[in-house]
Amino acid sequence: GISVTVKAPELCPRYIAHYVKDVKVAESPLWMRKRLALCGVNSINNIVDITNFIRLEIGQPMHAFDLSTLEGESIVVRRAEDKEKITTLDGKEFSLTSDNLLICDAKKPAALAGIMGGLDSEIKDSTSEVLFESAKFMKGNIRTTSRALGQSSDSSRAYEKGIDTYTTGIAMNRALHLVQELGCGTVTKTGIDRDAKTEPENKPIKTTFKKINAVLGITVQDDTITDILRRLNFDVTVENDSITAVAPPYRQ
């Protein structure tokens, strides 16, 4: 079966992989091609377009591997060995150091983590099995690798701004939903989520309604304040005049 091992959790705190079978690689529907074009992104095929669409819609870069090219049906997230080489999708070959993060199969590199996929594992017209990737890679490492190699992409630029581990799961669910909506594959139950849970928990914010009104300079009813925060997905607790709120992960 498919396995995922994260050997460098300090550079990849969360990695989600999901297997899709019976894949039919084809042109994306017109509505998706139009939306991508409006954002300056060329349509490639339905599978790759799903990953690009999600990056634009949610802000989470994704990648799709042709599963048949992954030795041992394995994903290993690890630091590169000194002078290890990878050829990326654009045909460029890079010599790496241990500062660079790789997505590998059981034997060889399959992608330069967060920057670009490897040439060997790209989605082709004949691809029938896909492994979707949604991950959080640390922005400092992506920036350092991108500058050192002189290689950047839409994905690396998004990662350099910082990605929340919460978004990683949302993006994968959205990708699988689009696979079903476009009818381009069968979503299996084979999904693996490696979460090192290194994200700091959101600290509760405690204050009073009186102080909120003093800062605002207007009077807002207690119930209205509570209602607004709850509609913004804050976890709110009220006790007499004091209010405690915990922000959702994406509002840290």
What are these regions (language model features)?
Residues 1-252:
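RNA/tRNA-interacting regions in translation and RNA-turnover enzymes
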